Amino acid sequence: MMTKHKKCFIIVGVLITTNIITLIVKLTRDSQSLCPYDWIGFQNKCYYFSKEEGDWNSSKYNCSTQHADLTIIDNIEEMNFLRRYKCSSDHWIGLKMAKNRTGQWVDGATFTKSFGMRGSEGCAYLSDDGAATARCYTERKWICRKRIH
């Protein structure tokens, strides 16, 4: 036979569990709803994976028309997320490389070489094998990124 206290603890436990589940669902939905249609939310940022192709400069311009930049890759989790969602196509990212193998992101930050970069051309893209460079006039899809405010 269950005492009043046991019933009370069970009811409180069920209510707390229900509230936690509701909060998790709401936070997940809110984070995604802060991103525009066709954009994907991850780590307080929204990402757009283009369906069309363009050279690096036109890709950068297309992102700017959406109040975004070609994506910057801040950490390995972000790199893994981008590689997972880009499917099999190569996508331009917001990194330009100089002849001396130094790189600069579109926000002005220096490329810290936190991940490998194949190739010796001027503009960076993401492939199935990671990051690489190509001639900037090559047509590729692109990835835009903007922060959630």
Curated annotation (Swiss-Prot):
Q: Which UniProt keyword terms apply here?
A: Cell membrane, Disulfide bond, Glycoprotein, Golgi apparatus, Lectin, Membrane, Signal-anchor, Transmembrane, Transmembrane helix, Ubl conjugation
Q: Which GO terms describe its molecular function?
A: carbohydrate binding; identical protein binding; receptor ligand activity
Q: In which tissues is it expressed?
A: Expressed preferentially in lymphoid tissues, and in most hematopoietic cell types.
**Localisation per UniProt entry:** Cell membrane; Golgi apparatus membrane
- Disulphide bonds annotated for this chain are C35-C46, C63-C144, C123-C136
* Source taxon at top rank: Eukaryota
Entry comment on modification after translation: (Microbial infection) Ubiquitinated by human herpesvirus 8 protein K5, leading to endolysosomal degradation. N-linked glycosylated; required to enable surface expression and the extent of surface expression correlates with the number of functional conventional N-glycosylation sites.
Gene Ontology cellular-component terms for this entry are: Golgi membrane; plasma membrane
Q: How does it sit in the membrane?
A: Single-pass type II membrane protein
* Membrane-traversing stretches: 8-25
Primary localization class, coarse: membrane
- InterPro entries of this UniProt entry? C-type_lectin-like, C-type_lectin-like/link_sf, C-type_lectin/matrix_domain, CTDL_fold, NKR-like_CTLD
Q: Which GO terms describe its biological process?
A: NK T cell activation
Q: Which residues lie on this side of the membrane: Cytoplasmic?
A: 1-7
The residues that carry sugar chains are N57, N62, N100
Regulation: induction: By TLR activation. By IL12 and IL18.
Q: Which residues lie on this side of the membrane: Extracellular?
A: 26-149
Q: How does it assemble?
A: Homodimer. Interacts with NKp80/KLRF1.
- What does the UniProt function comment say about this protein? Membrane-bound protein expressed on myeloid cells which acts as a ligand to stimulate the activating receptor NKp80/KLRF1, expressed on the surface of natural killer (NK) cells. In turn, stimulates NK-cell cytotoxicity and cytokine production leading to the cytolysis of malignant CLEC2B-expressing myeloid cells.
Listed PANTHER family: C-TYPE LECTIN DOMAIN FAMILY 2 MEMBER B, C-TYPE LECTIN DOMAIN-CONTAINING PROTEIN 180
The molecule here is called C-type lectin domain family 2 member B
Species: Homo sapiens
* The gene coding this protein: CLEC2B
